[in-house]
Amino acid sequence: FRKQAMNFYNAAKELPIESKPLIAYYCCMNAAKSLISLKNDNDPLINISHGVSSDRNSNQSILNKEIILEGGGVLAKLANCIKDSTNKERVKVLDLLRNLPAIHRTFSITCSKKTELFIPIENIVFKLNKPHKKAYIQFTIDDAYSNGNALRNIPKTFEKTKDTEAVIFRVKKRFDWDIHRKESERIQKLVKYHNKIRHNFFYIRGFQTSWYIKKNVKGVVNRSPLVITYALMHWLSELVRYNPQEFSQLLSGHYNWLINEFMDICFQQFIDEICCEITGENIGYGKSI
């Protein structure tokens, strides 16, 4: 699977946008299968569905059509590997695009009437409350987003600190960190905490990694960017394969920039995140929490 993913990746990079989605999807699918096989004792993944479908006969405008995230297949197995939801769900294409941090600025400019979902954060650190022997994650909200409107929609997972010099939030949930306990026990608690909390943070790969949290507002799709990207890539690949005329119309219309950015940035981001999940390491110049 890994070798196939690499071959499709190298091929997709050289293709024009009109045909790129088809090959890029097969790269993403094989990359996902690499992770699934690793996490599930070399699962051969024989005769398995893609885990995504859509109604190609829908009369809805193209980006208002729904993608069905199935409860089985490659998509569900990928979701299970990263502790994401595996429930069957129908979501509009536009809503899925809106929930991708890697293209959130492009989406906000393209669809200016929709509320921006992502808040940039910095200075993300683990903090220790020594008297209580409890640790947690803390971060600073970007100054441009430290106003009342943005702060009002921060998820209840986080709470504001009493710091007066900057707008600092922390994760409400704590974990035990007692220096008198064995290091192995402490690390085990940290890893367990990390696995539960990490999905509340989002990153964009780059020379300087950018970090975000997602607002708690209408339109939020509580699925991992990996799952969302996989589903969208499958949908676009089917559009290219079965209805190239409609895909051509999409590229020549209002959403041209958004689709091009998705195919460029989110494709690269997907591979980066999969590699991070497989290795447990920071890959390239992007990194994952």
Which sequence ranges carry the predicted segments?
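Terminal alpha-helical segments
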Residues: F1-I289
